[in-house]
């Protein structure tokens, strides 16, 4: 009331120091004359290349010790090149623009190419990118849009998905030295001992795999033992992709056994084709497959890979039971080929072999299965019976039921 104070907004924005005192980085196209005035390096002298023969063991910035490299003539004046280099974020903040015009020798990117390709449909990365790299990238796009009205791009990424980490238990010996899973063994799955001298191991919490804690798993070893498809299947089946994956040998073995079951199911399909029966439940099988196509397509769009794997377990149980009943050859081929196509992103090597064996029964069409909407339409309609405005009953009747 006494008007002794006034409103003021203090922004927490600060200048961003983009230079670094190190060799590995993009040279800054700035030089200094003998009076220490700033001089722009002419475009015809760009790009500036870093010296290849350099001693990285010197104190401070290694480029400060490269006298010959720093000496440059600009407009007949002796100048000294800037020895600071740009932070790596400066380069990584607009690399996707360069991908649009990779062969352009005159400019970093072409506006017409940007209009055609950008923005990026989907960005997938660690959660730390959301507060660093993506923030810088957006700033660059805003700045370019501000400086060039033809740029017309402010949001570089339409979608962001941050995946979880792969985790594993940690192990230490009696001297608190980290141990790798290959250096220990267990007979009961609870108590662990060292392979070398049979000393009990301290089991720590499950943490994201890292070389420092030595809780990593060699993927090549897993692939050699179980196959690439089993490794791929387990990683996607264990948990939602935005959550951490808890690595376990039991989980790997479970995925491996499921692929074996799928192979036996494949053999049943091949055997069933030779019978050429008249199907009693062809319509039900086709309806089930179309429902599965719809589920998996929707789950793919929302990155629900673990739910898709659960759908495949249900699919196995359904067809393992249905193959005991008569199915027409046409229905069998059409539905099974679609099933293999649905499986292909998850177990590509397996489905490639299966489709090869099915090649004589089908056209060479590897497009993603489409849902037949008519088949999925409900055959029944719901009729609500009201008397004097009050609901008395609900009837579920077939669409083709007559008035009588």
Task: Locate each region found by the language model.
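Family-specific functional microsites
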Residues: 276-277
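Long, hydrophobic, amphipathic alpha-helical segments used as structural scaffolds
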Residues: 270-273, 304, 323, 347-354
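S-adenosyl-L-methionine
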Residues: 280-284
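Catalytic cores of secreted or luminal carbohydrate-active enzymes
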Residues: 339-360
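C-terminal low-complexity, glycine/proline- and small-hydrophobic-enriched intrinsically disordered tails
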Residues: 246-253, 303, 310, 317, ...
């Amino acid at each position: 009331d006494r008007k002794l104070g006034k409103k003021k907004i203090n922004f927490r924005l600060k200048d961003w120091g983009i230079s670094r005192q190190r060799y590995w980085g993009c040279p800054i196209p700035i030089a200094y004359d003998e009076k220490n005035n700033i001089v722009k390096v002419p475009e015809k002298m760009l790009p500036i290349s870093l010296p290849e023969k350099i001693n990285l063991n010197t104190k401070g910035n290694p480029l400060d010790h490269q006298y010959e490299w720093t000496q440059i003539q600009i407009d007949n004046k002796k100048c000294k090149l800037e020895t600071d280099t740009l932070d790596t974020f400066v380069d990584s903040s607009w690399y996707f623009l360069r991908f649009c015009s990779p062969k352009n020798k005159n400019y970093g990117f072409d506006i017409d190419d940007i209009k055609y390709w950008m923005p990026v449909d989907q960005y997938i990365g660690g959660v730390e990118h959301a507060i660093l790299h993506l923030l810088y990238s957006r700033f660059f796009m805003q700045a370019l849009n501000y400086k060039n009205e033809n740029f017309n791009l402010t949001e570089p990424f339409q979608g962001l998905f941050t995946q979880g980490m792969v985790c594993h238990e940690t192990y230490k010996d009696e001297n608190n030295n980290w141990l790798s899973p290959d250096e220990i063994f267990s007979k009961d799955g609870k108590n662990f001992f060292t392979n070398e001298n049979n000393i009990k191991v301290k089991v720590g919490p499950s943490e994201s795999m890292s070389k420092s804690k030595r809780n990593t798993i060699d993927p090549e070893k897993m692939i050699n033992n179980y196959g690439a498809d089993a490794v791929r299947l387990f990683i996607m089946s264990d948990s939602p992709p935005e959550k951490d994956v808890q690595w376990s040998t039991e989980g790997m073995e479970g995925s491996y056994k499921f692929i074996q079951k799928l192979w036996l199911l494949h053999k049943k399909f091949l055997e069933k084709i030779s019978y050429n029966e008249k199907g009693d439940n062809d319509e039900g099988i086709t309806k089930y497959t179309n429902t599965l196509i719809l589920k998996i397509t929707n789950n793919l769009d929302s990155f629900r890979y673990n739910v898709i794997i659960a759908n495949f377990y249900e699919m196995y149980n359904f067809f393992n039971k249905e193959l005991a009943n008569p199915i027409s050859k046409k229905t069998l081929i059409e539905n099974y080929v679609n099933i293999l196509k649905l499986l292909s992103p998850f177990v590509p090597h397996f489905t490639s072999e299966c489709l090869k064996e099915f090649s004589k029964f089908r056209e060479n069409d590897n497009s993603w299965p489409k849902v037949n909407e008519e088949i999925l339409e409900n055959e029944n309609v719901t009729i609500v019976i009201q008397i004097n405005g009050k609901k008395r009953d609900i009837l579920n009747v077939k669409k083709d039921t007559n008035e009588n």
